[in-house]
A protein has these predicted regions:
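Regulatory/sensor and coupling segments of signal-transduction and defense proteins
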Residues: 1, 15-16, 34, 137-140, ...
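Short, surface-exposed, polar/charged, turn-prone segments marking secondary-structure boundaries
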Residues: 42, 84-86, 159, 194, ...
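Alpha-helical scaffolding flanking metal-ion-dependent phosphate/phosphodiester catalytic sites
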Residues: 7-14, 32, 52-72, 80-91, ...
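Short alpha-helix-to-loop micro-motif enriched in aromatics/charged/Gly
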Residues: 18-25, 41-49, 65-67, 117-123, ...
């Protein structure tokens, strides 16, 4: 008997599970994925690159094992101990072939641009894009909790620009500053638009033939996330 699975639905379900780790900050990974796609689109990327950025954004914190760790990641703009969960998340994904391509950028998604620039390729750019979108969301999430997102946009843009050429790739920051001039970039981060975005992406996702071994791998990923 042939087995089929919608891997888009698997990624989205994993993202929903990760939201439970955040408790007080749901949709963090979803917002990171949405922003990563918007920034990449500004750079003229193709649909395959955008799909990878979206999936990597959804799952970038798959290595976060507790609400306490999640809280530190979303409260501290830059934290020396952040690399551990990136390594663990990459290890988890590397062992699951359908999502193994996400492991390299996720491993590096808290690495500063200054540590990447001497060997900077597609993987490193994707990793720094995740880092950028992740840190934007840390700032935006606080503003949303205070119901002051649009009021705080200038300060968020200024803080991100202050780390250009240090934490973040200058080209990515330029793209962010360009696309984030529009209110629509920020309004898309609210809960309703985020869920609408997820629904649109899921609607036409194809079924893929798979094996029992792959389905067992899916179960293993879920067991790590919700343990």
């Amino acid at each position: 008997m042939s087995l089929f699975v919608n891997f888009r639905s698997v990624v989205h379900a994993l993202s929903d599970s990760l939201d439970l780790v955040g408790i007080n900050d749901v949709h963090h990974g979803k917002r990171v994925g949405i922003m990563a796609v918007d920034i990449l689109r500004t750079l003229g990327s193709n649909s395959e690159e955008q799909a990878m950025a979206f999936d990597a954004g959804l799952l970038h914190d798959i290595g976060v094992s507790s609400s306490d760790l999640h809280r530190q990641l979303v409260e501290d703009f830059d934290w020396e101990g952040s690399q551990g969960h990136a390594e663990y998340g990459a290890h988890m994904l590397a062992g699951f072939p359908p999502l193994a391509h996400l492991a390299p950028p996720i491993r590096l998604h808290h690495t500063h641009w200054t540590e990447l620039r001497d060997h900077y390729g597609k993987t490193e750019q994707m990793a720094n894009l995740l880092f950028l979108a992740d840190r934007i969301d840390v700032l935006a999430a606080v503003a949303m909790l205070e119901d002051r997102l649009l009021e705080k946009v200038p300060a968020i843009r200024e803080q991100i620009a202050g780390h250009v050429g240090d934490m973040f790739d200058p080209d990515l920051v330029t793209a962010f500053l360009d696309v984030s001039r529009k209110e629509s970039f920020w309004l898309a981060l609210e809960s309703g638009p985020v869920l609408d975005y997820m629904e649109r992406v899921s609607r036409d996702a194809p079924q893929t033939e798979t094996s029992l071994e792959i389905l067992q791998g899916v179960a293993t990923l879920f067991s790590h996330v919700v343990d």
